[in-house]
Amino acid sequence: MLQWLHSCWPFGKYRRQKYVPLDTSSSCPDRWKIEIEIAQPPGVFVGDILQNSDSDASLRQAYLLAVQLNNITDYLKRFDEASVPESCKSVVQTQITKLKSVRNIIWNTMLSMAVGGVTIDDAALKTLLDKRAGESIALIEMEKLATAIVMDDSKAWAKEINNIILSAEHEKQILVNSEVPLIECETLAAEKTTTPAVSI
């Protein structure tokens, strides 16, 4: 009878599924694994870090470094895909070079943690994570620049920036040129006022 009713139920036979929460007791949460696997250099795996004698500390440090590295990689991908105007290429290229140098430092650190079984001091880790702190303003400007490059095909904003830079340089040159004659006049006046030496 129940088998016959099963075929008549509009949504199929009711089966109660027990909720099984994610395992939080593991020393390596899934999110940590994903972040580290994305950021690891080629040939290095999470298992290499777990073999470390102080695996808990090294795993936490590897996760923090991985998050930082993945953010840097995201910036680099966005600027590789964007077409940067000529007037902005020098600024963008400088920031890209800095980000690539930080990425190489983090990769070398991860290799040392995986292969050499080393952990880094918390103070050194904080310094490495705050490596971009001094460049935060430049990164904000890069964020605006990347958004503008992607959204605006006309590049009118780049022309405006270029005009502002050129006008500022022009004003500076005018100021320098206006100061030069004053200096020359002062030196000539000083030469005229000097009394010639009288020979006896």
UniProtKB/Swiss-Prot annotation:
Pfam family, one: Herpes_U44
Main location (coarse class): virion
One term under GO cellular component: viral tegument
Alphabetic keyword roster: Host cytoplasm, Host Golgi apparatus, Lipoprotein, Palmitate, Phosphoprotein, Virion, Virion tegument
Post-translational changes noted in the entry: Phosphorylated.
Ranges in a coiled coil: none
Lipidation (S-palmitoyl cysteine): C8
Keyword Phosphoprotein: yes
Position of the signal peptide: none
Annotated compartments: Virion tegument; Host cytoplasm; Host Golgi apparatus
Family: Belongs to the herpesviridae UL51 family.
Subunit description: Oligomerizes. Interacts with ORF42; this interaction mediates ORF42 incorporation to virions.
Chain's role: Plays several roles during the time course of infection, including egress of virus particles from the perinuclear space and secondary envelopment of cytoplasmic capsids that bud into specific trans-Golgi network (TGN)-derived membranes.
Identification of the protein by name: Gene 55 protein
